[in-house]
Design a protein with these regions (language model features):
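Positively charged, low-complexity intrinsically disordered leader regions
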Residues: 3-134
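Active-site/ligand-binding loops adjacent to catalytic centers
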Residues: 69-71, 201-239, 247, 259, ...
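Active-site nucleophile and cofactor-binding loops and adjacent substrate-binding regions
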Residues: 108-119, 137-146, 237-240, 266-271, ...
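A short, small-residue-rich loop immediately preceding and capping a beta-strand
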Residues: 121, 129-168, 261-275, 295, ...
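Alpha-helix C-terminal capping segments
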Residues: 124-134, 148-160, 181-182, 279-289, ...
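Active-site-proximal loop->helix
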Residues: 138, 146-209, 305-317, 426-434
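Claisen-condensing/thiolase-fold acyl-transfer catalytic domains that form or cleave C-C bonds
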Residues: 269-277, 369-435
Length: 458
């Protein structure tokens, strides 16, 4: 097996080559993402209105569409060096197994205890909370990677951490729950009886397996009902995509180091944190006309926000207590089926990603979970990494694109984000291996109630 042009299996940046600034793609966007709206006044949210919910510096980052780069504080840079720079891996073995002329690379973000990219933003948000003198933070988590990452970050800065975990994942992934507790976090299955909004959701949807929207509502209520606490979010918000830009910046630097030009960039899409972070420098070049890339967002067919959602203002949470965001959404009342990609079970999408999609700078596809797990197992057997179900959505489409190259003979360069590992997802792998996994694709009538509940905004 040759490594033409002496491209190694793993491309690592040196520590002194790591980015020292986050890139704010909003500053380069011709059409800025629509502002968050106050659900009461329907006017853009102000700094003062967001202050009770988020840390002050994070509010500033959230509202800033113009600053191109933000300096990464030295303390955060030092923490990053525990697990960054992360490798850009040439998937030589996958290429050989597929018999494709395509060149496949993946950015591996699973080389830390959280098992995912989520630590990139968790440590930033915990840093700003500590700097503000807060007691602790609250949050939601789907599959548990974000909750794990935040518990690690809070432990590092000696902050209290309260996590509301989507009930289906709380039950399916007890080991990830215990990792959070090991780092000092308290973990509550959502929806729960511990909050007013949780009790209301349980009354309206008895036996529900929960959703990220439900967990967000509970975490926000828990933060705003006690002093010294703020809410932090693992995805969706512009501030999170800002912190996650380190993924794309490192990826671009690693490619440039070997004069590699990507043709296709692929990321899984739930709320948009990994996707937005990975694609940011690539889409920035595309906006400025400096390069052209096919950028593909991959979402589950059971929760198809981009491919079947509506571009409208909607609540970010099921309890309708958060600001309104303009995004591709299935409606805040939409509760997805209990699929095995808990991190992608969100009714909406980042406003930044939504605007990029609406402007046709990126495209989107949805895939069924049985096909996703087929790709996951194929990848695991040849590349030696057990991928998370979320990441495996990107693997599925990367394989599909590589097989298209096999048909056409094109030597395209495909880059995808391997967001994390699947070692705590063995219930899902077991269902697949036993032939018990099923696909659920909502019908139009299934989606209609969510759309009917969208806020009426002139």
């Amino acid at each position: 097996m040759s490594t033409e042009k002496k491209i190694p299996y793993k491309i690592y940046l040196e520590e002194n080559e790591m980015p020292t600034q986050w890139y704010n793609v909003r500053a380069d966007m011709k059409n800025k993402p629509a502002p968050l709206l106050n659900p009461g006044t329907l006017k853009p949210m102000t700094f003062e209105e967001l202050q009770p919910v988020f840390c002050d510096e994070l509010v500033r980052q959230e509202l800033d569409n113009d600053t191109l780069y933000f300096d990464i504080p030295q303390e955060i840079q030092d923490f990053y060096k525990m697990y960054r720079p992360s490798p850009l891996v040439r998937a030589y073995f996958l290429e050989k197994a597929l018999g494709t002329p395509a060149k496949i690379y993946y950015k591996f973000e699973g080389n830390n205890t959280s098992g995912s990219h989520k630590l990139n933003s968790a440590i930033a948000q915990a840093y700003y909370a500590k700097k503000q003198g807060l007691t602790g933070v609250t949050t939601e988590t789907g599959a548990g990677q974000w909750g794990t990452a935040l518990s690690m970050a809070c432990s590092y800065f000696d902050l209290d951490c309260k996590v509301y975990m989507v009930k289906v994942s709380y039950e399916q992934k007890p080991f990830r729950r215990e990792v959070m507790r090991t780092y000092g976090a308290s973990v509550t299955p959502s929806p729960s009886e511990t909050t007013e909004v949780g009790r209301r959701i349980l009354a309206e949807h008895p036996g529900t397996s929960g959703s990220l929207g439900c967990a967000i509502s509970e975490a926000v209520e828990a933060a705003t009902s006690r002093s010294g606490y703020r809410y932090v979010l693992g995805s969706v918000l512009s501030q999170v995509l800002l912190h996650q830009s380190i993924i794309g910046l490192e990826t671009k630097a690693a490619l440039d180091k070997y004069d590699i030009k990507a043709d296709i960039v692929i990321g899984c899409a739930g709320g948009g944190s990994n996707l937005g972070g990975l694609i940011s420098p690539f889409v920035g070049e595309k906006i400025k006309g400096e390069a052209d890339y096919r950028i593909i967002a991959v979402e589950p067919a059971s929760c198809p926000s981009l491919t079947r959602g509506r571009y409208a203002y909607d609540f970010c949470d099921t309890g309708m207590i958060c600001p309104l965001a303009k995004m591709y959404t299935l409606g805040s009342g939409f509760i997805p089926s209990a699929n095995h990609a808990g991190g992608l079970r969100y009714h909406g999408m980042s406003s930044v990603v939504s605007q990029l999609y609406d402007d046709k700078l990126i495209e989107a596809v949805s895939v069924e979970q049985t096909e996703v797990f087929a790709a996951a197992e194929q990848f695991a057997r040849v590349e030696g990494i057990l991928p998370a179900p979320e990441s495996s959505h990107a693997i599925r489409v990367a394989i599909d694109e590589a097989l298209k190259c096999k048909e056409t003979g094109e030597e395209k360069t495909i880059v995808f984000g391997l967001t994390g590992t699947g070692y705590f997802d063995m219930v899902a792998y077991g269902k697949y291996n036993d032939g018990e996994m099923t696909d659920y694709i909502p019908t139009d009538s299934d989606l209609e109630p969510g759309f009917a509940g969208l806020p009426k905004i002139d």
